[in-house]
Amino acid sequence: MTRAAERGQGATGWGLRGALVAIALLSALNAAGTVFVLCQWRGLSAALRALEAQRGREQREDSALRAFLAELSRAPGRVPEPSQDPMSAARNKRSHNGEPASHIRAESQDMMMMMTYSMVPIRVMIDLCNSTQGICLTGPPGPPGPPGAGGLPGHNGSDGQPGLQGPKGEKGAIGKRGKMGLPGATGNPGEKGEKGDAGELGLPGNEGPPGQKGDKGDKGDVSNDVLLTGAKGDQGPPGPPGPPGPPGPPGSRRSKGPRPPNVFNSQCPGETCVIPNDDTLVGRADEKANERHSPQTESMITSIGNPAQVLKVRETFGTWMRESANKSDDRIWVTEHFSGIMVKEFKDLPALLNSSFTLLHLPHYFHGCGHAVYNNSLYYHKGGSNTIVRFEFGKETPQTLKLENALYFDRKYLFANSKTYFNIAVDEKGIWIIYASSVDGSSILVAQLDERTFSVTQHINTTYPKSKAGNAFIARGILYVTDTKDTRVTFAFDLLGGKQINANFDFRMSQSVLAMLSYNMRDQHLYSWEDGHLMLYPVQFLSAASSQR
């Protein structure tokens, strides 16, 4: 028990000691704060006394200055005004509003001026000047200062009373179009207008389904008409060789001629060493010689010269033509686009360059860029049909000719580059029509025309596919076909001989759209329409090249 009591008294003593230590720390902090506040108060009191002393000095200076200035303001009333001499009066004219007050000078007044330097508030000086009615200790006026910056614009004034109406002015320019107003009421229907011109002929529609089989008709009467002989057909293939004929009678005895050198001897090479039992080799040699120098072979084109541009127009497709038969006729005809009904007729080449023309109206719409002019007549394809029209200038009634088994619709063109189904060509041998067969849909055919009867004399199948052709022309009875890019002549066909001829030469360098290509025998030039450029190409024949050698 005694030990427990001692332990309790020891714990109580330690608690009292901790409390006393905390109270001592708080007292020390309080004393330190009090000392700090007293120091700050003393500093602030000293600063306040200094400010009050400075303010007292300023007030005393202000009161002294006010008393001095008041004394100065009362001094001019007691001093008599001295008489002014003319020079003094002239010097004192400094105001336009009146004569200014005389200046106080030390020489004429029994006064002593004392100048002191002190700091005077600006507000005090302003109040002094206002109270003395303009009498200030200022010097003479200085020069006028620069003009100040422009002020802000003032407020708009109120509208004035409307004036009298003036005279009517001149009519002004037409103003801008105003906003569209509300739609008006529906008016009464107008009178029926005149019937317009017919539009361009469209392409034929697709073939319809076959109709139902009709009833059997009545038996017809027996005809006594004599059937006319049809046109001459194509030449058939050569037949097989026939049997040898009987031996002929012996010939008359002749003197033996000289033996040709190097013939049938041991030194001759190749097939010439074989001794023939007939004249086969001799005949073949003669045929080759005749073919090499035949007039038709010499009519071939060897080359095409550099082109010359005649005119540039806007239309990509078109045709320009000159008379082929009559050399004295200088007229030029132009059709624009690959479909239309109007033809421009120019008097001559200068009229073409100056765009001076006469407009001709055709009886039927044309289609394509394969027209031709021959003996004062225009030959062209009637759009939407397999008909060729011959329109003689100066007459109203045209002539027509139908070509059976020819493609003329569904954009199955003969030449896709020029959108042409039929190409009419005129050369030294007559009038030709180049077209595509509808039987196989690919071969190029040529029909020869009889100008007098305007009928077909023969059809020639070249067997050349139109898919490989870009354009074509006929010169001296030979058909020439270009490639699909119209840069080279890759095929030739002898229309009179009915056989293909080897031909492969350059035509042009450009790859523009070749809408029209035609040979004119009048000047032996190729006429072309290339993307709006009207061009001329000189032609070189084999006969001319041989004569130059």
UniProtKB/Swiss-Prot annotation:
| Ranges facing Cytoplasmic side | 1-17
Q: How does it sit in the membrane?
A: Single-pass type II membrane protein
Gene Ontology terms, MF aspect: protein binding involved in heterotypic cell-cell adhesion
InterPro entries given in the database record: Collagen, Olfac-like_dom, Olfactomedin-like_domain
User: Compositionally biased, Pro residues: which spans?
Assistant: 237-250
Domain of life, source organism: Eukaryota
PTM annotation, UniProt:
N-glycosylated. Proteolytic processing by a furin-like protease causes shedding of the ectodomain. Further cleavage by BMP1 releases the olfactomedin-like domain.
One GO cellular component term of this record is: axon
The residue ranges flagged as biased composition, category Low complexity, are 200-210
Q: Which residues cross the membrane?
A: 18-38
Work out whether the entry's keyword set contains Metal-binding.
Answer: no
User: What sequence ranges are listed for the domain Olfactomedin-like?
Assistant: 296-543
Q: Where is this site: Cleavage?
A: R94, S95, N277, D278
Question: Ranges in the Extracellular compartment?
Answer: 39-549
Start-end of Basic and acidic residues biased regions? 213-222
User: What's an example Gene Ontology biological process for this entry?
Assistant: clustering of voltage-gated sodium channels
Expression (tissue specificity) = Detected in sciatic nerve (at protein level). Widely expressed with higher expression in testis and skeletal muscle.
* Keywords tagged on the record: Cell membrane, Cell projection, Collagen, Developmental protein, Differentiation, Extracellular matrix, Glycoprotein, Membrane, Neurogenesis, Repeat, Secreted, Signal-anchor, Transmembrane, Transmembrane helix
Its annotated compartments are:
Cell membrane; Cell projection, Axon
What the record says about disrupting the gene is: Mutant mice present no obvious neurological phenotype and have normal nerve conduction. Nerves from their peripheral nervous system have myelin sheets that are indistinguishable from wild-type. In contrast, they present impaired and disorganized attachment of Schwann cell microvilli to the axolemma at nodes of Ranvier. Mature nodes are formed by the fusion of two heminodes. During development, mutant mice present defective clustering of sodium channels at heminodes, but display normal sodium channel clustering at mature nodes.
PANTHER family (alphabetical): GLIOMEDIN, OLFACTOMEDIN-RELATED
* Domain note: The olfactomedin-like domain mediates NFASC/neurofascin and NRCAM binding.
Give the function comment from the record.
Answer: Ligand for NRCAM and NFASC/neurofascin that plays a role in the formation and maintenance of the nodes of Ranvier on myelinated axons. Mediates interaction between Schwann cell microvilli and axons via its interactions with NRCAM and NFASC. Nodes of Ranvier contain clustered sodium channels that are crucial for the saltatory propagation of action potentials along myelinated axons. During development, nodes of Ranvier are formed by the fusion of two heminodes.
Q: How does it assemble?
A: Homotrimer (via collagen-like domains). Interacts with NRCAM and NFASC/neurofascin. Interaction with glial NRCAM enhances interaction with axonal NFASC. Interacts with MYOC.
- According to UniProt, the name of this protein is Gliomedin
Species whose genome carries this gene: Mus musculus (Mouse)
